[in-house]
Each structure stands twice: as C-alpha cells, then as structure tokens.
C-alpha cells in the first residue's frame, strides 16, 4: 500500500513539473501580447480559427491562445491569471480535472481552455450546478469572450426552443447539467429536425465536477407523461396501514437504509387488507405500495430528505448542497407515498418516455473535463467511469488555515451545547463563524439555540436558498455568524472583511461529519482562501448517523467508564477512525454507482441505437420507401417463419388472417391463393401484393413532400410508443432480476441477456406496427400542417379482429413459447394467446 501511495505522489509531482514547463511557454508570449493594440489582440481569434481550419491542432495553438486570454483578461476584467491558473487551464484542455482549492480562481482558470476549444466552432458547454451560477459566470466572463470575438449563450429552463437553439449555436454555452440532459432527451422526441436545439456534444467543462459526476451520477433525468391508472386511493390505504404498525412490525437496516416487514408486520398486512397470503403473485402491486409507504414513513425524513412547500408540494432536498431540487420527483411511486404521508395532494403517477443518467450523458461528450477543490478522494471513480485523471494544483500562496482535531461528545445535546458556546465566544471577539450542518432540521435547531444565547446570525438552507448569494457575501465580515446546510457546490467565495485577518480569519464549525470526506473538505475549504488565515473544527457525537453506523458502541463504553457525559474526546486517532468510516461509506457508494452503471449501460447501448435511427429518419430528405418496404418484408418473413411448425391448414389460416387484418384489403386474398405454395413462395407472394398496396396508399398523398412527411410521422410515432413501453419493461426487469441472485445467477448478466432479447422483440414489434399502420391507414389528402393526422387508422378494430381470429381447432399446447402467435398479432406466443393460457 505504501508503495502504491508513493507511486501516486511521485506521478503527481512529475505531472506538476510538466505543467510548470508548459505554463512557462505560455509566459514567454506575455510581452509579445502586451505590445499588441486592442484591435490586434482581438484579431488573434480570427487568426487562430483560420489556422485551426487549415489543419493546426488546438494543442499547437495552446500557448499563444492562453497568452491572448491572459492579456485580454488583464485589459477587460483587470485580472491576470497566475501560473497555477494557467497550469489548471492546461489540465482542463487535456480532458482532466485540476484539483484547485477554494478561492484559487477556478472561474478565471476556465477562460483559457474554454476560449481555446471554442476556436474549433464545434461548441463548448460550461456546466454549472444552478442557473444563478450560469448567469453570473456568463455575465462576468462573457465580457471577456465577447471582447475577444466569441459568442456566448445562456441556456435557461424558461427559454423557448428557439432561444435555446440560439444559445447552443453560440461558441460558448453556459447551462446547468440538468437542462443539458433534458434538452438532449427532448431533442430525441421531436418529429422535425428543425425543432432540435442541440448540436453534437463536443466539449464540456463542468464546474463542481465531483458534485455532478459523482454525487448526482445515479440521478436519472426523466421525461414522462401521465399514467392512465388511478392509484391515489392505494397510496392512502398503504400509508394508513403503515402508520398503524409498531416497531416490531418492520425491520430497518441502518447501514443500507433499507426497510421491510417482519413476520408480525406481514400478519397485520394480511389482516388489514383481508388477504390469505401477502406475497401471492396477484398481490405484487400491493406490496409495491406497502414498500413505498414504509420507506416514506420510516426512512425518508421531513426537513432532511425533503421539505413541504407553502404550495403543499413535496420538494426534494439535495443531500450534497442543501438546496431544494425544483421539478425533481422521486421515481417508482416513492414521491406519491411521501405525499400521502404528509397529507398533501397526491400528483398523478407518470410513465417514463425517455431517461438518461448523468454518467451516460457526460460520457457522450467528445471531451470532458471539470473543476473542483476536492476531487482527489474520488480519483479512482473519475478514472474508472469517465477516463479522467485528477491532478492536484499547488496553491498560489501557502495555506494558513488551522484544522483542529475532531471533538467527540457522548450525546447530541452535549455536542450542540459546546457548539453554541464556541460560536458565542468567537462572536464576542468579532471573529466570523460559518456553522455547517447536514440537515435543515439541524440548522433550525442551532438557530433557536443561538437566539436563546443572544447571538445574531443568518440561516442558509433549502427553505431560503434564494438569499444565498447575499448571505454568503457577508459571511466573512467582522462578527458575522452564518448557519449553512451543506456548503458544497455553493460556488461563491467568502471574502474576509476589514480587521478579520487579525482575529484569525473565518472559523468553520462542522456539526457532524458527512458520509463523504469530500463534502467535509469542501466545508473546511471555505476558510483560508488565497493564503488567508482561518480555522476549522468538527464537533461529533456518538448519536450522529455516521457514528451509529460504524462502531460507536466501543467508544460509548469509554465515555461511560470515564463518566464523561458533558466532556469531549479529542485525538488525531479519533479523526483517523472517522475518516476510515467515511472511506467505507464512500467505497459502498462507489460500488453502488458502478453497479447502476452496469445496468444503465444496457439501456445506453439500446438508447443510442434507437436515437441514431430516429435521427436518421428526422434528418432524411429522401423517400423512406426502401426502409418501410424492408420492414414489411421482414414482418412477413417473421410471421411465416413463426408458423413453420404448425399443421398446413392451421398455418395457412393463421397467415391468411395476418394478411387480411394487417397487410392487404380483407377481400383481396383467399386460402386458394396460398395453397400449394412453399414458405418461400408465400413470403414472395405476400410481399409483391403488399408492394402494390403500398403504392396505392402513397398515391393518395398530394405530392412527394407529403409522402416524406407521412413516412416520418408514421415511423416516429410507432418508435416512440414502443420505446416508452420498452423503458417501462426494462425497469420492471431490473426489479425482477435482483431475485435471481438467490438462484446463484448474476443479476447483471441476466439483465443484459434478457434486455437484449426484449430489445430484439421491440424491433420486431416496431416493424409489425409500421407495416400494419402503413397498409391499413385511411389516408385523406390534407394540407401539410395536418400531416400528423394522416394516420386515421382502423388499427383498433384490426387488433380486436386478429385477436379473435385464432383457429378454433388449433392445439395451443403444440406451440413453442417463443414462436409467433398463430393469431397473426406479430407477438411471440408467450406474450399473446400463450399468456392467457
């Protein structure tokens, strides 16, 4: 282990030396750029773009381009990037993460690689965690980019598609991570190419990269529509039942935060819902509602995991930033269960139309980089998942902050008493204090204690984040006391007021350790910026979540033996033990994210295939007849092959039914037309007849443009409907394969294999529906804007007809489960009439 650490440290040192040499080359252009007039300096952008178009690489332009940005920043912003900032910029250009301490000027550092990569004309996305930071950085740094001749756009959720498209067309686009994801999903749901807003994803520079790519990695972005099934009554019933339980009726695993019914709880459920066996197959839906009600009532905590807004809505609290996540809802019915718990209106369940996780969204960029002050602890995950290195950049000035050892108390009460006393003492001498909490509830509790102690203060949490910038701006002033929930990702520096340096700078007090060392380091990093003095102190208790989960029992015995109910234990060993516990949690979380990615990669591969084919259809300026006719041919082949093992009469009747109800006019084909033909001849006969029907259908359309429009809308509508159903089916499969681990099967391998089979089934189903709609649609000539309405189809009654068309004397027991159903539906037997068996 020691050798591994030594190798890592040596590699970092070697990388720093290499970066210093590259930065020195940038500095060699300093005098040359300073000698240029404003117009000459601005003209460099045009020169660089031409050189790039003529074959020069961005790497070869780096030294001059960085020097131009440095000089431009000095003239426009009054800021001149330091050597360490240039080094950070080089790391960003190479698609890695520079770890730069708070206050080291990451925003200015980003200007150099952003400018350089924007020269390609392919677009640069600067990604932030919230719209406030997007607007702030775009306004401040946009002044420099515009002066240098580059266009800057801001992509906000409130903008229209046209405004979004304009923002994405700019050389540099500022946006939040979620908005880029939703725009990507929405682009892959439009019917016309002109309605797409994004260009191909080129280069992303992610601010607070660890927050987005690690903390929110598993967060799925979901575009959904309303579900037709009304379920609010079931949520209320499950909630009422769960609230009636005693502690013995359920089992909570504190470490994994999971919950389930005990034997007595199962008995009570069967009595409450009047069931013989709760876990009978027909009660699967009910157990899902009960599981969500259990989680909502006993795992999800008000003012920690979520808050109830004044509008009676459940708002999720981001566990890493303390902000509420507007518009974000828990999936799979958990949000509705919480609404039932809190007695607020239950919103309709939704059905997922499209989804993607941040992991897979950002892996789609040609080049990805990001900035953070605390990324080294997650280096393995950055490297394994995103192929990104984390390179620590030296500070411009030595760090003077004093990090005290943790103080451990026996109880939460004694801990908070000590926190209030410490804050009061520092307030009285004028030293500003930032108190970091992990929950809204804790910040409110400390606030009440400080009011009682006569200490004026500000509170920053999910309930009042709109005043965030103003509160943080004043947090470094003399005598300021600020309580903040999870300072991670706040993005605003705390600058020291007059006379504060002499008082020891800003003191950061942590009221408990977070699961992640990185979040603790981010809180600490708010103090001691740019060589300022500062202090940090963490207060812990044996009743804290982290301590309860990892080994507080042994320490509890020490407190009891020494009779130290009000006193604290302080030692470096304790701090190391806490960090070891955090490492275990981080390891567990990483393993979970890695497993999620393995599942999500199945969806990613399938999504990329569907979206690529969808894009080809949308952007096609050609007659799609070859594609549609190929679908018709494959559908005919599937149906004929699917009945190859049936008796001749039964086979012909099933094929005839398929042809009548899905392919040809009902009275245009008889049994005699197919009798005596081989399977190959039947396929050819049906296909040739289908081509004539196809030509007849197309001839009803006004002109070539109407034909193209009709073809596109037809294919896209079918693909979108089938893809939505497929996403739902994959979600259900994912929940089901977990149980296969008990049969010594690898759930991920099972999911991959079954998911692949389901995808192939979906493709067959898409081609079947396109065939049926194309051949059976009642086409009326209309004006072009009504093109989407051309598909006035008899499909509904066709479905009823072919479902009723099963030959009466057919022995269903002779049909294989994976063969096509003889009724002609195009579905496998197990998913059609076989299901009813």
From Swiss-Prot:
Primary location: membrane
A Pfam family it matches: SEC-C
GO BP: intracellular protein transmembrane transport; protein import; protein targeting; protein transport by the Sec complex
Swiss-Prot/TrEMBL keywords: ATP-binding, Cell membrane, Cytoplasm, Membrane, Metal-binding, Nucleotide-binding, Protein transport, Translocase, Translocation, Transport, Zinc
Catalytic activity: ATP + H2O + cellular proteinSide 1 = ADP + phosphate + cellular proteinSide 2
EC number: 7.4.2.8
Binding site for Zn(2+): 821, 823, 832-833
Recorded family membership: Belongs to the SecA family.
Main function: Part of the Sec protein translocase complex. Interacts with the SecYEG preprotein conducting channel. Has a central role in coupling the hydrolysis of ATP to the transfer of proteins into and across the cell membrane, serving as an ATP-driven molecular motor driving the stepwise translocation of polypeptide chains across the membrane.
PANTHER family: CHLOROPLAST PROTEIN-TRANSPORTING ATPASE, SECA INNER MEMBRANE COMPONENT OF SEC PROTEIN SECRETION SYSTEM
Protein name stated in the entry: Protein translocase subunit SecA
Name of the gene encoding the protein in the UniProt record: secA
